[in-house]
Amino acid sequence: MAIIREHSTAQHSTAVDNEIVSFDKEKDNLIIKGNNLLALHALKNEFAGKVRQIYIDPPYNTGKDSFNYNDKFNHSSWLVFMKNRLEIAWELLSDDGTIWISIDGYESHYLKVLADGIFGAENFLDEVVWQRAYAPINLKKTFSKSHDYILVYAKNNSGAKELNRLPRKAEMVASYKNPDNDPRGVYKADNFSVGPAVEKNIYEITTPSGRKVLPPDGYSWRFSKERFEELLADNRVYFGKDGNSAPSYKRFLSEVKDGVVAQTLWTYQEVGHNQDAKKEIKSLFDGQAAFGTPKPEKLIQRILTLGSDENDLVLDFFMGSATTQAVAMKMNRRFIGIEQMDYISTVSVPRLQKVIEGEQGGISKDVNWQGGGSFVYAELFPKNMGYLQDVIHAKDLEELKSVYERMLSGTDTDEPADISFRADLSKIDWLQGFDENKRLLVKLLDKNGLYYNYSEIDDKNVRDLISDEDYTFNKNFYEGGD
């Protein structure tokens, strides 16, 4: 198990279970199982300023989200939960990076205020509205919600900051014509008049047919008379096939910036909806709804198109069903994914293995995905976390007593639990019942000891617990193999 410096550690193998003892930060993709806050701290020294784009889809704090986190905090607890993670994530972003956060209307306004404080209101780029549903739910008494939001911030929103552009659709290109066979190629004939009127740009134009033309009432020409003469001499003014129409300005496709600027309303026809996402998951897992709240691959494709380029590093620390990582692999981005829930081994990692094998769902056909790629899988090495999970999953008082005895003795786990210095063991009273004692046992555990610290890696009691391969992997990851 590879220990995360100053915080915790990780078991490792590739997605195909190959033994590895090294990690190339410039090439390898990384999946980490464990608490995402601790994992982010663990990554900070190695990846600060190196992540081009972050996308996260955190628990929405509604009580209805299928994230197996505590998805019904009060507002203040949820905001602290988010704040701790966003502050570290911000340090990982490169100077030209962006962070994209999916959220629903329930917490979007609170999150916006929090994010402004962390990232700087001046770095807020915009709020995207994604149409996640298209059919109304008639059981609703007021409104049937059909959209979520995506908040977008830049690490450095200078005046020169630009996002990438979206590819032009075929129908957009088809609207460019070349009726007069201009050697510069196809163009759009843009309106030559604009409003409100600018007095100096109101003048008479004579068409090739000899007709005298003035701009419509309340309007003036787009250009001054001097500029019009220059454009006319350069054959950039079009008067229609018969030379008798009002002037138009030729806007050549060859001179327009590649792609189009993204709008802030994303419809389901463009980027998919929730049901599309669920179908994508079902198609990968024999028709089973393996994950309740995935995002459609087309949505993530658009986000990565706008915020990153090939070979850039993309981070998602609420990895879920691994949609971000699957799309990143298909789009030739490097990625880091973090997930603490057990479905990482039944959904997330198997999904990425299917991507490597060349599965043809989601955006695969759009990008001509043929398979390939790899990733390194790591787990934070649990210390108190193992005991905590045992307490949480205990089904009765006898099972709880057994966990408590192991916490104190270390039987079957090689090491006893780290008990909080604030804990009062005398308060354990088995006559109080199951629920009360479960709560007390959770409080006993030192939350700073959920995972083994990298600083402990050479301690004999820790060194004896990890394999030589994991030891070497950690040394390579944090110290370049020293």
Residue ranges with predicted function:
Residues 1-5, 23, 28, 44-48, ...:
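Accessory, often C-terminal, charged low-complexity segments
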Residues 17-28, 65-70, 275-288:
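Short glycine/proline-rich turn/loop motifs
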Residues 36-54:
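Short amphipathic alpha-helices and their capping/turn segments at secondary-structure boundaries
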Residues 49-64, 115, 314-328, 381:
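Conserved proline-anchored active-site loop of SAM-dependent methyltransferases
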Residues 52, 59-81, 94-96:
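Mobile active-site "lid"/loop adjacent to the S-adenosyl-L-methionine
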Residues 97-102:
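Conserved beta-strand signature within the Rossmann-like core of class I S-adenosyl-L-methionine
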